[in-house]
Amino acid sequence: MDPVRPLFRGPTPVHPSQCVRMPGCWPQAPRPLEPAWGRAGPAGRGLVFRKPEDSSPPLQPVQKDSVGLVSMFRGMGLDTAFRPPSKREVPPLGRGVLGRGLSANMVRKDREEPRSSLPDPSVLAAGDSKLAEASVGWSRMLGRGSSEVSLLPLGRAASSIGRGMDKPPSAFGLTARDPPRLPQPPALSPTSLHSADPPPVLTMERKEKELLVKQGSKGTPQSLGLNLIKIQCHNEAVYQYHVTFSPSVECKSMRFGMLKDHQSVTGNVTAFDGSILYLPVKLQQVVELKSQRKTDDAEISIKIQLTKILEPCSDLCIPFYNVVFRRVMKLLDMKLVGRNFYDPTSAMVLQQHRLQIWPGYAASIRRTDGGLFLLADVSHKVIRNDSVLDVMHAIYQQNKEHFQDECSKLLVGSIVITRYNNRTYRIDDVDWNKTPKDSFVMSDGKEITFLEYYSKNYGITVKEDDQPLLIHRPSERQNNHGMLLKGEILLLPELSFMTGIPEKMKKDFRAMKDLTQQINLSPKQHHGALECLLQRISQNETASNELTRWGLSLHKDVHKIEGRLLPMERINLRNTSFVTSEDLNWVKEVTRDASILTIPMHFWALFYPKRAMDQARELVNMLEKIAGPIGMRISPPAWVELKDDRIETYIRTIQSLLGVEGKIQMVVCIIMGTRDDLYGAIKKLCCVQSPVPSQVINVRTIGQPTRLRSVAQKILLQMNCKLGGELWGVDIPLKQLMVIGMDVYHDPSRGMRSVVGFVASINLTLTKWYSRVVFQMPHQEIVDSLKLCLVGSLKKYYEVNHCLPEKIVVYRDGVSDGQLKTVANYEIPQLQKCFEAFDNYHPKMVVFVVQKKISTNLYLAAPDHFVTPSPGTVVDHTITSCEWVDFYLLAHHVRQGCGIPTHYICVLNTANLSPDHMQRLTFKLCHMYWNWPGTIRVPAPCKYAHKLAFLSGQILHHEPAIQLCGNLFFL
C-alpha cells in the first residue's frame, strides 16, 4: 500500500448491528429526523366551536377509525402509536425547566384538560404511510410525505426554529379540548355536494383562563422592529375530514389518485395523508363517492366525513400552516438541510480557508400575544471543502501510530453533510472493518454493494474502495405498522463533508474575522435579507398562490412595536460609585479604583519553563505596579523554573512544592502556546487532587509589551476573585435575597452524562458565591443531588448572615420550550422539598427559565433604517408567549451583527415580584459577571454556573474539591 495513505483496515474490534441500512434504500422505513423544539404554544390550545343551541344529537365519531386530534397530527407526519416507555424513568436534568409558575396577584383556576388517547396502529386506517416518527413540541411537527401536483402532502415540517438539537422524550401525550358538537346534516342532495347553507353561527368555547400580568412601565419608550412578519387568516375555518375507503385500499398512492379524481367535489386545494383530509371549504356532513380501482376494476366506495372545524388562528392549525410554508420555501428552490432552508447556488466561497457558506433562512409560524406571525431569521451553513476522507488522510500524516484513535476522537460527535441528498448526520462511530466493497440488503431483499448503490442511485463513482465506513445510529422509532426499527446508517467518508467551523480555525483571529464578516449581518442587512425573502414569495406566483389557497397572507414588512430602555445601573466599588455609560463598559474605573474586597497575596508560586523566564519577570513586575490602584497587596512569588514544558514536569514540581509549602494561596503557571492537555492536567491537580486556586497563562498573551498592562490587570482581578475577593456590585433593593444560577453541560465523550453547575449568592449584596457540581448519570435520580446543593448553599448563607433568605430567585439555563411541561412538576418540587431540612422555613421563590438560543432579533428604528438597540432594551408584549409570564431583554452591548435578546420565562412567582421588579433585577444581575467589566447576555449566576459545569465536564471529569466551593475558582 502507498505509504502516504492511511492503513484503514485494522484489528479494532467491531460489534455490527443486526441491521445495516443506507439512506434512501428503504422506502417503507423513512430516514430518522432530529426534531428541534419550537417556541410556539402547545397543541390543544385552539378555539373549539359549538353551535349556540341545537337539540339534535351530537356528532359521534367513527369508533373504528380513530380521528380527532391524534389523527390530525398523524396526518401531518406525527407518529402517535403506542411506544414502550423509555428506560429513563426520570426526565434528564439537562435542558429541562424548573416548572411553571404564576404571579401571586393572578387569579388562577385549576382545570383539567382531557388527553386524547394514543390509538393502536391496528385501529387506524390501513396503508403504507411513509410518515416518519417525530415528537411534538409546542410548535414542532416532523414527517415526510410524497409530493403530488394538486395534493399537498403533510409531513416533515418543523413549526419553529431552534438553534440547538434536543432529544425528544420517548413518548408523549397530546392535549386537546372537547371535540366540537356539529349539527346533523340535512338530507344529501344528489345535485349538490357542497354546502349551500349559509355558514353556521359558531360560538367560540374557551375555558376560563387566568390573566397574565407581564407588562412593566419603567424605562424610556423606544420604537423597535422585529424579525416577525404578521400573518392574516382570511378563511373562516379549516375543515378536517376523515376519509374511508371500502373495501380497504392498502396502497397510499392509489388512495391519493382516487381522491384526486374527485377534485370537482373537494376542489383543487387539499391536504391529504391517506386518511385525514383538510380543506378550506365545508362539504356536507357525509359525502359518498365512487371510484374504480384500475388494477382489478373493483368499485371502491369513498366516504368523506366531517370531524373537526378548526379556527384559522388556533394552535391546532399552526403545525399545518408550517407544512404549507415549508412547501412555499421548496417552491422558491431552497434546499432543506437539517431544519432550515439554504440556497447552495448562492454559496460564498472562502477559498483561503477551504470553506463554503450557504445563505438561507430559518422560518416558522408561531402564535404569540400579538397574534399569528412568521418568525424568519437569516441562517448560514458553513460547509468545508474537505471531505471526511481528506481529514483522515491529514490525521494519518500527523500521527500514523495512533491513527484510528485520533480519527475516532476527532470525528465522533461531528456533524457531516452528504451533498448527494443534502442531509446531515451525526457520526457516532467508525467501522474500520467495513469498506465500500461490502454489501448490504435493501428493503426489497436484494443485496448490493455500497459501490454499486451509489453508482446506480446517484451516478457517483467511489474512488477509494478501501476506506472505512462512518456509522450514524438514529434513535429508535416505529414504522407505519408499529414495528420498532433499529439499525445503523453507514456513510462513506469520501462522500461526507464536515460542517461547522474547525477548532483550529476558531483560534485563528484572521480566519474568524473573514468568516464573521460574511455571516454577522448588521440590522440593516438582516432586514434587507428578510425583505428579499418576502419579495421572492410575492413575485413567485406559485409560492404566493400556495399561501393564498389556504387563506394566508403575509404583511409586506417586518412587525414594529414599542419597547422600553431600562434605566442605567449604579456600579459600586469600595470607595466610589458611578452610573454606567451608554456602552456599559467600566474597565477604566475598576482598574484605577479599589475593589470592594481584595485578598492579600503573600504566598504564591510561579511556575514557568526556562525559555519563558523573561516574560515571567515582566509579568510579576507589572502585577506589582497595578496592584496598588485596585487596593491589593502582593508579595514576590516563589520562583520555580522548569527544565522543560512536559506535563510530568509541571505536575511533579507543583506537587512537590504543595507538599512542602502548605500555605500556598495561588499556583500560577506559564505555559508555552495552547496546550489543552497540559491545561487539563494542571486544573485536575489544583481543583481535585490538591485543591488550591490556580491561574494558567499562555505565554503569548503576555508576550506583547504594548498589551501587557491591560492583560496583567485582567489577570490580577481574576486572581483576586479566585482567592475570594469581590470586585464590584450593584444596588439590590430586595433584602435577604438569594440568587441561584443553574446550567447543564452534556459530556459527549462519556455517555452523554449531564454535569450540573450550581452557583448561589450567600451574602446580602450578591457579591459572595457558593458553588457545587452534580454529575448526573442517565438513569440516576437527582433529588439527593439538588438537595445537597441547595441545602449546602442555605447553610453557607446562614453562616455569613446569621439568618436564612426570605426570597430565593433561581435562573435556570439550558432549557427548551418542548420540555417546559415535562419537567414543570419535577425540579421545582425538589428544590422546595429542600426547605424541609430547616424548621418552619418557607421562603418565597421565583424561578426563571433563561433561553439564549432563540431566533428573535430586535432592531432600533432610526430615521432611515434599522440599527442595533441599546443595552437594556426590554420587550414584554406582542411577541411574548400566550401561556407564560415572560419578557425579552437585550442586556449586552452588541458590537457585531443584530441584537439577539435573551428570553426569560417566569415559571414560578410566589414572591409577588411585579414585571418591573423581574426585569430590573435580571438587568442588574447582568452587570455582576466579574470576568468582564460590562454587561453580558445572561445574569451572572447563570454564567458562573455555565463556566463551572464546562470546567467540570470538559476538563476535570470530576467534582471539584469541596474546599474550593466558597470561591469563584473556575473563572
UniProtKB/Swiss-Prot annotation:
Annotated region (Disordered), positions in chain: 102-124, 159-200
Post-translational modification: Arginine methylation by PRMT5 is required for the interaction with Tudor domain-containing protein TDRD1 and subsequent localization to the meiotic nuage, also named P granule.
Catalytic residue positions: D743, E781, D813, H946
Keywords associated with the record: Biological rhythms, Cytoplasm, Developmental protein, Differentiation, Endonuclease, Hydrolase, Meiosis, Metal-binding, Methylation, Nuclease, Oogenesis, RNA-binding, RNA-mediated gene silencing, Spermatogenesis, Translation regulation
Disruption phenotype annotation: Mice exhibit blocked spermatogenesis at the early prophase of the first meiosis due to transposable elements derepression, and apoptosis occurs subsequently. Female mice are fertile, while male are sterile.
BP GO terms, sorted: germ-line stem cell population maintenance; meiotic cell cycle; negative regulation of circadian rhythm; oogenesis; piRNA processing; piRNA-mediated gene silencing by mRNA destabilization; positive regulation of cytoplasmic translation; positive regulation of meiosis I
Chief place of localization: cytoplasm
Modified residues (Omega-N-methylarginine): R74, R83, R95, R100
Effect of R45K: Abolishes interaction with TDRD1
E.C. designation(s): 3.1.26.-
Piwi domain mapped to chain residues: 666-957
Reported tissue expression: Expressed in adult testis, specifically in spermatocytes and in spermatogonia. Only detected in primordial germ cells of both sexes. Widely expressed in tumors. Also present at early stages of oocyte growth. Present in the mitotic spermatogonia. Not detected in the first stages of meiosis (preleptotene and leptotene). Detected at the late zygotene stage and increases throughout pachytene, declining from this stage onward until expression stops at the early round spermatid stage (at protein level).
Gene Ontology molecular function terms on file: metal ion binding; mRNA binding; piRNA binding; RNA endonuclease activity
Alphabetized Gene3D superfamilies for the sequence: 3.40.50.2300, paz domain, Ribonuclease H-like superfamily/Ribonuclease H
Highest taxon above the source species: Eukaryota
Location in the cell: Cytoplasm
Cofactor(s) needed for function: Mg(2+)
UniProt keyword annotation of RNA-binding present: yes
Modified residues (Symmetric dimethylarginine): R45, R74, R83, R95, R100, R144, R156, R163, R549
Residue ranges annotated for the PAZ domain, each copy included: 387-500
Keyword Iron appears in the UniProt entry: no
GO CC annotations on file: chromatoid body; cytoplasm; cytosol; dense body; nucleus; P granule; perinucleolar chromocenter; PET complex
Subunit structure, as described in the record: Interacts with DDX4, MAEL, EIF3A, EIF4E, EIF4G, PRMT5 and WDR77. Associates with EIF4E- and EIF4G-containing m7G cap-binding complexes. Interacts (when methylated on arginine residues) with TDRD1 and TDRKH/TDRD2. Interacts with TDRD12. Component of the PET complex, at least composed of EXD1, PIWIL2, TDRD12 and piRNAs. Interacts with MOV10L1. Interacts with GPAT2. Interacts with Tex19.1 and, probably, Tex19.2. Interacts (via PIWI domain) with BMAL1 and CLOCK. Interacts with GSK3B. Interacts with TEX15.
Function: Endoribonuclease that plays a central role during spermatogenesis by repressing transposable elements and preventing their mobilization, which is essential for the germline integrity. Plays an essential role in meiotic differentiation of spermatocytes, germ cell differentiation and in self-renewal of spermatogonial stem cells. Its presence in oocytes suggests that it may participate in similar functions during oogenesis in females.
PANTHER family referenced in this protein's UniProt entry, alphabetically: EUKARYOTIC TRANSLATION INITIATION FACTOR 2C
Name this polypeptide is given: Piwi-like protein 2
